[in-house]
Amino acid sequence: METFAEYILREEDFAKKIEIMFYLKKKTNIFFDNTVIFKALIVKLFIESMEIDIDENKVVTAMLLCGCKKINNAQDIEKIKSYAKEGADFLSKLGFSKEFCLICEQHNRYSNSFPRKKESDILELADQFGGMLLDRPERVAFPIEEALILLENRNLKNCNNYYLNEFKEFINIVKEIKVW
């Protein structure tokens, strides 16, 4: 019998993946909303536009799933630090490989697991940058320029993200053609 992991990874159509995620949310009550779709779209556009040599389908799927155990209460710091690990454990039960689960777990740096996967660096960029572009209960969305500066000089200060320079180039291209 096919696992959920095999099922969603076999599907390469983005819209159909979104539909699969919608039904997974209904069945398991995972975290899945428009912010997840927005960040996954950033991943997809980044990989395609910059011609990144990586398994796009796997990374987009990971972006859709990496926050599956996220909570809406951003005030609980312990939950913020543990949701990626809890999500990776949950994904393992759905049949995802150790590598895939590690990619999802490493999308934030709280797991402290090394070496980091390149795919995790892409998730980290889309998650943090995309999050800054969205309104939150505690703040309004940042303008693109400010979000990019904060990403580099605050969020990823003293962090080695393999794709940061390419991501900045991508955002500047997107900004010029006024996609956002």
Residue ranges and their predicted role:
Residues M1-A84, V179:
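Acidic/His-rich, divalent-metal-binding segments that scaffold phosphate/diphosphate chemistry
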Residues K70-N72, G131-L134:
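Short small-residue beta-strand/loop micro-motif enriched in glycine and branched aliphatics
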Residues L45-S49, F90, R154:
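A generic secondary-structure signal
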Residues G87:
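Alpha-helical segment that forms one wall of the substrate-binding/catalytic cleft
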Residues V59, M63, L91-L125, G130, ...:
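Histidine/acidic-rich helix-loop-helix segments that form or flank divalent-metal centers
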Residues F32-V36, F90, K118:
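Amphipathic alpha-helix face/heptad-repeat signature
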